[in-house]
Each structure stands twice: as structure tokens, then as C-alpha cells.
Amino acid sequence: MENIIVIKLGGTASDNLTENFFQKITEWQGAEKKIVLVHGGGHYITKMMEALQIPVETKNGLRITNQQALEVTKMVLIGQVQPTITSAFQKRGISVIGLNAGDTGLLEAERLNDRDLGLVGKITKVKTNLIEQLLAGNIITVIAPLGIDNTYNWLNVNADTAACEVASALKAEALYLLTDVPGVKNESEIISEINTTEINKLQTSGVIKGGMIPKLESAAFAAKHGVGQVIITDSLENAGTKIRSKVAIG
């Protein structure tokens, strides 16, 4: 399927969807673009865990997830964040549906090799049939970043990773990773473009750290696996940082 745009909503973006955002979505739909959203919810998961007095721990930008933390993650993503997003679309008369790994095993996953992270997984397969059927009906799909393994256990998946896997599986023409910052910064300057070969150097030099590490690694994967363009930004209007997979010639 052509003309697919995947958008990852992260940080507190689900509570700050602007009229400009919805206007852009409407413009894209008018141009026969098909829209898929993958949402995070880390901020709200942390707030809920703190309220329940569950320790919050991370490693290399990923949340360490035991069974208790996983249950909170599922509750917040499927029961709080996703309905907030879908309701905002419905309020504006835009057809939308929320999906998660429980829907026809949408996102198959396996645990990461780093067992210190607990019940954290990586996507091994995106079952695109359901998504494509909905997109053919001009219905926006909103996907929670949770996976199910081959023994039907749920796994927490980094939302950037999930978005990049979905975009790659759909061969999207564009992937927007929306976050709380306007792009990748080197001190106070936004880096306009990053080659995938530069990411390790930027990490070693401390330019990128924390949650930006898995974000850039995921973006690099998407850029190398069939996604037309990958952009890290804080809004659909801003240029942000483009991730490219080949060295420019000339």
C-alpha cells in the first residue's frame, strides 16, 4: 500500500495535540495519504507507578519492566493514553480506531537479550493485514507499543522502536517521531541531518544520551529498511532532524 505516513506520538504529545496537528492530518487525508499513529506514554506510566509506589528504573533509555510494571504499562497505554488520542480525533469527525497487540496478534515480539530490562521486547513481526484493511477504508489506526511473544506473554516495547518497525513493515513514505524537543541538539543547535553512520560517534561524544539513544537507533533502522524519510521533531510543521541512511555524493 502506497502513501502511508506513520507518526509516533511521545512524551506528553497525546495531551497536546494542536489544531495545527489535526489540520495537517486532514490535509494529508485530502491528498489520499494513509495515516498510522504509534503512541508512547512513558510520562504517564511513570506518574502512575510513582502514585502506586512502584520503583521506576531505566537502563540506556529503556524502562526496566517487571510484571507489576508491565501491568501498569498496559493499563496506562490501553486504558488512558490511547482513548485520549482517539477521542481527540473523533471530536473532530476523523475516523479512527485504537489497536494493540491483543488484536489479531498485531505486534509479535520476543524478549531482549539484556535480561536486566525484564519484560521488555523487540518487535519480530508486524501483521500488516489488519492495518492495511483499516487504511483502505480511510480509518486512522492508533497503535499501543506492546508486543506478544510466541507463548502469548505481553512485553513492553519502546514506542520509537515499535513505530519504526511498523513504518518499515508498511514501507511508509515518511515517519515522524514526535517528541518533546524540536530535533536532535548539539548543545543549543538543532542538527538538521544525521547520517546513520554518525550515530555511534554522537553517542560516544555525549551529544545524544538517555531516551534519544534508542530513538536514533530506531530511526536508523527505519531509514535502512524502506522508509522514505525519517524525521525527529516536536511538531509536523517543524523541520526537525532528518535521519538518512546514505552518505551524500558531491
UniProtKB/Swiss-Prot annotation:
Entry's localization field: Cytoplasm
GO molecular function terms listed in the Swiss-Prot or TrEMBL record: acetylglutamate kinase activity; ATP binding
NCBIfam families: argB
Any one GO cellular component localisation term in the record: cytoplasm
A Pfam family reported for this protein in Swiss-Prot or TrEMBL: AA_kinase
InterPro entries: AceGlu_kinase-like_sf, AcgluKinase_fam, ArgB, Asp/Glu/Uridylate_kinase
Enzyme class: transferase
Name of the protein described by the UniProt record: Acetylglutamate kinase
EC numbers on record: 2.7.2.8
GO aspect biological process, one term: arginine biosynthetic process via ornithine
Keywords: Amino-acid biosynthesis, Arginine biosynthesis, ATP-binding, Cytoplasm, Kinase, Nucleotide-binding, Transferase
Catalytic function, reaction form: N-acetyl-L-glutamate + ATP = N-acetyl-L-glutamyl 5-phosphate + ADP
Role of this protein: Catalyzes the ATP-dependent phosphorylation of N-acetyl-L-glutamate.
PANTHER family reported in the protein's UniProt record: N-ACETYLGLUTAMATE SYNTHASE, N-ACETYLGLUTAMATE SYNTHASE, MITOCHONDRIAL
Pathway annotation from the record: Amino-acid biosynthesis; L-arginine biosynthesis; N(2)-acetyl-L-ornithine from L-glutamate: step 2/4
Primary location: cytoplasm
Entry-linked HAMAP family: ArgB
List of residues binding substrate: 41-42, 63, 156
Marked site positions, Transition state stabilizer: 8, 215
Family according to the record: Belongs to the acetylglutamate kinase family. ArgB subfamily.
CDD domains the UniProt entry points to: AAK_NAGK-like
